[in-house]
Amino acid sequence: MKYDTSELCDIYQEDVNVVEPLFSNFGGRSSFGGQIITVKCFEDNGLLYELLEQNGRGRILLVDGGGSVRRALIDADLARLALQNEWEGIVVYGAVRQVDDLEELDLGIQAIAAIPVGAAGEGIGESDVRVNFGGVTFFSGDHLYADNTGIILSEDPLDIE
């Protein structure tokens, strides 16, 4: 399904929160939407492997990496795992790497930057916690919609049809 965040903001202005324009699209899917699972981890993506091994149909992994752009939390292997398990997308308040490979995958991926240095894989972090960045507070179960224009968040699913 294709999402137009500008149109959704026009229709649901009172029901959505707009994330500050910090993010760029790195995935092969220009728009995506779904229910979020929140993760908080800093320069360590071990927990992301565990979560992306789960069925992701209709879900988006929302990663609070503390805004660090020193180490990439998402790489091509993690993105392929997400795609294999039918995740709709990944939003990272942090960095990604292997950008050329990410662009080839039919997966929504938004992050604040790219860097070639990979993250540690110790599994340090927590999931299903409240996270806050970009002027918005996110909870697991909220609904996120993203495209090349921006990212919006709604407590309940929006009627897109």
Curated annotation (Swiss-Prot):
Q: What is this protein's record name?
A: Regulator of ribonuclease activity A
**Cell location:** Cytoplasm
Give the Gene Ontology MF terms in alphabetical order: endoribonuclease inhibitor activity; enzyme binding
Q: Provide the function of this protein.
A: Globally modulates RNA abundance by binding to RNase E (Rne) and regulating its endonucleolytic activity. Can modulate Rne action in a substrate-dependent manner by altering the composition of the degradosome. Modulates RNA-binding and helicase activities of the degradosome.
GO biological process annotation, one example:
negative regulation of RNA catabolic process
Specify where it is mainly localized. Answer: cytoplasm
Record GO cellular component, one term: cytosol
